[in-house]
Structures are given as structure tokens and as C-alpha cells.
């Protein structure tokens, strides 16, 4: 599915790169593993190739899809009337999908709220993490300009 050198996105961790595909033996069973270096933490993660689909790891978004996401980021509606506990759960679920559009919506909504009033500590941390995940992916999209990246700030 993925090749060495592919840029990927791992939900809740951000963008990374497939550095190797290695065979390891664990409990007397040999398995192929993707060796992924995560760009945010510089941590190396090993995921069995057989579990890659269930891990929700996906390729980095392309520039065409990004234009649609930028439009939603700038013009999409935010639901500001939800109680914070419900909003926090919805936003957590969105981030866990690993989809760039869902993450961008979380960043957009929390940034809009932050302009109106201070976020509580949990939502501030969520905004910081979601923004970091978003930027980590934007930085590796082929053909993206610095201006496009800054439009998410």
C-alpha cells in the first residue's frame, strides 16, 4: 500500500514519512512493519503492514483537495451553541478520524471561539494539538505555497 519515502498522516500524531519496511519476529511470528518517522515528535513508530488500514493511516492530502478544505476553513459555519463538554467530544472524534478536513474544522471553530473569549485549558490544548497536526501535513503537500499554509493561521 505504501512505499519507502511516502509521506503519510497518522491520526492524533500528524504527518510522517515511511522510512523503511522491515521484517520483525514477535512471539515466534514474522511480520512486515512500516517504520514511520513522525515529523512533530521525531518519534519512530512501527506498524504491522497487516494493520495499516485499521490504523487509519492515510496518504497526505493533495493540492486539489486542499483548495476545497481551505474554502471550508474560511467560509464554513461553526456551531458555537453546543455545551463545551459536547463540543469537546465532537472535536475529539473529528481529530481521531485523521482526516484533514475534520482537523481543519476543529482548528477553525476553536480559533473563532478564542477570538470571542478565552478557551478553557482542555480546549486550548486541543487547539494547539489540532493546529500542529494540520500544519505538519500542510508542510509536506506537494505544490503548496507558504501563503496557503499561513491562511490556516
From Swiss-Prot:
Pfam families: CarD_C (PF21095), CarD_TRCF_RID (PF02559). InterPro entries: CarD-like/TRCF_RID, CarD-like/TRCF_RID_sf, CarD-like_C, CarD-like_regulator, CarD_C. GO terms for biological process: rRNA transcription. Transmembrane segments: none annotated. SUPFAM superfamilies: CarD-like. It comes from the Bacteria. Belongs to the CarD family. This is Putative transcription factor YdeB. It comes from Bacillus subtilis (strain 168).
Amino acid at each position: 500500500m505504501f512505499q519507502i519515502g511516502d509521506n503519510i498522516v497518522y491520526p492524533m500524531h500528524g504527518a510522517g514519512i515511511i522510512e523503511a519496511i522491515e521484517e520483525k519476529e514477535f512471539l515466534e511470528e514474522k511480520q512486515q512493519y512500516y517504520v514511520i518517522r513522525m515529523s512533530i515528535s521525531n518519534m519512530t513508530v512501527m506498524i504491522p503492514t497487516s494493520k495499516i488500514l485499521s490504523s487509519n493511516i492515510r496518504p497526505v492530502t493533495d493540492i486539489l483537495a486542499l483548495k476545497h478544505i481551505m474554502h471550508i476553513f474560511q467560509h464554513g459555519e461553526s456551531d458555537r451553541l453546543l455545551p463545551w463538554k459536547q463540543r469537546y467530544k465532537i472535536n475529539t472524534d473529528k481529530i481521531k478520524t485523521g482526516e484533514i478536513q475534520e482537523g481543519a474544522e476543529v482548528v477553525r471553530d476553536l480559533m473563532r471561539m478564542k477570538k470571542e473569549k478565552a478557551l478553557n485549558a482542555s480546549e486550548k490544548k486541543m487547539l494547539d494539538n489540532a493546529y500542529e497536526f494540520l500544519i505538519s501535513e500542510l508542510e509536506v503537500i506537494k505544490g503548496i505555497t507558504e501563503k496557503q499554509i499561513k491562511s490556516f493561521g
